[in-house]
Amino acid sequence: MSFNHKTIEELHDLLVAKEISATELTQKTLEDIKSREEAVGSFITVSEEAALKQAAAIDAKGIDADNLMSGIPLAVKDNISTKGILTTAASKMLYNYEPIFDATSVANAYAKDMIVIGKTNMDEFAMGGSTETSYFKKTKNAWDHTKVPGGSSGGSATAVASGQVRLSLGSDTGGSIRQPAAFNGVVGLKPTYGTVSRYGLIAFGSSLDQIGPFAPTVKENAQLLNVIASSDVKDATSAPVRIADYTSKIGRDIKGMKIALPKEYLGEGIDPEIKETVLAAAKQFEALGATVEEVSLPHSKYGVAVYYIIASSEASSNLQRFDGIRYGFRADDAKNLDEIYVNTRSQGFGDEVKRRIMLGTFSLSSGYYDAYFKKAGQVRTLIIEDFDKVFADYDLILGPTTPTVAFGLDTLNHDPVAMYLADLLTIPVNLAGLPGISIPAGFVDGLPVGLQLIGPKYTEETIYQAAAAFEAVTDYHKQQPIIFGGDK
């Protein structure tokens, strides 16, 4: 018997009633992972021994009836540090790296007696939108194994969508939670910048990165955010603001809520069927009592260019630490210190990572800094101001998560510009540090379509309120791929 169809609350009730034990739930989860892993390739590492040991310890002390997450398995993206469990960032550079500490988000999960079941596949150093740049394997879409799962948190999304786990953690720098959530028909939230500590997250773009949750439903997503969100003295960008319970508004109606629909989000480059799906969702929100009106975010069209200058510049700085000296991969054909650096980085990094390091180094170089990095920062401010103007009059922004449904494996991985453009709807949210969620909103050609809801900073509870209201009157979240036992 598999438990992957049961919600976290249902699993908690079973655990409290001792109808199942944490060990039994962990064993069943491991079976679900193994039976589906060959088809989707969600995991880099499955920490079976450690997970069963932790489950046994939880059983020995007893399930806490007041702790919803006690004994619940959790998958963690492989750029989030886990003490004693390989954390590779899907790179040859860190193929053998075992951290000696836990990321704060993981420590928070352990504090709630969650069980880390394994580390999920991703694009190398979170640089990519298809989970095809991983050094280890290519993850496949849960709905169609010839399609990409999205990225960079592709493994975390497919692990949930395929029924391997109920909950997972990802990271989002330019859409890396929301895009794979959309492609796989699950719920993925990028929290407000600073809501979840970045301590222990292997850095890509430090002003953009944010850890967030994946789940099959809106409420379960909010329940996981309750666990991982916290202020943290170890992260200088950690926000002091902390919502007591992100589920507090779930179930409330949205009558009177004002929702903005940017015309730029339905313009050139958006698949017509995606546009139709979003417009249908807008009508659904209106039927629920919200007002939906067209607005403009005029500088959003510059988001991709701005992002790839800023993110690559920050990456070129952050990735300087990987040099073959302290830990991780080291080239064995070097004859001196310079060759250690050059050969290690040439052999240890994949093509996409090297491309972004070169772009970032160029953007920061003397003579080009003002024309590229400084200018990108100025346009980033204009993008933020666009959002501020809209949120002066509206509660939320509505739009598609992605311009298309999942594309084929090996179709865009040799065309970096086309791959970058796939993030044009998610990137502005990171540039502005805002919260954004992707929820299932329909299907095109049998593949899931994601609907994105964006709010002002620290309004995750309002986003969850609107998302849950939409979820309650639709059944897209209930439809499952064949690998999960569905009929799609």
Swiss-Prot record:
Gene3D superfamilies: Amidase signature (AS) domain
MF annotations from Gene Ontology: ATP binding; glutaminyl-tRNA synthase (glutamine-hydrolyzing) activity
Domain of life assignment: Bacteria
GO terms, biological process: translation
Database matches in InterPro entries: Amidase, Amidase_CS, Amidase_dom, AS_sf, GatA
Annotated EC: 6.3.5.7
CC terms in the record's Gene Ontology section: glutamyl-tRNA(Gln) amidotransferase complex
Keyword set, alphabetical order: ATP-binding, Ligase, Nucleotide-binding, Protein biosynthesis
Annotated NCBIfam families: gatA (TIGR00132)
Family: Belongs to the amidase family. GatA subfamily.
Subunit structure, as described in the record: Heterotrimer of A, B and C subunits.
Protein name: Glutamyl-tRNA(Gln) amidotransferase subunit A
Organism of derivation: Streptococcus pyogenes serotype M4 (strain MGAS10750)
Gene: gatA
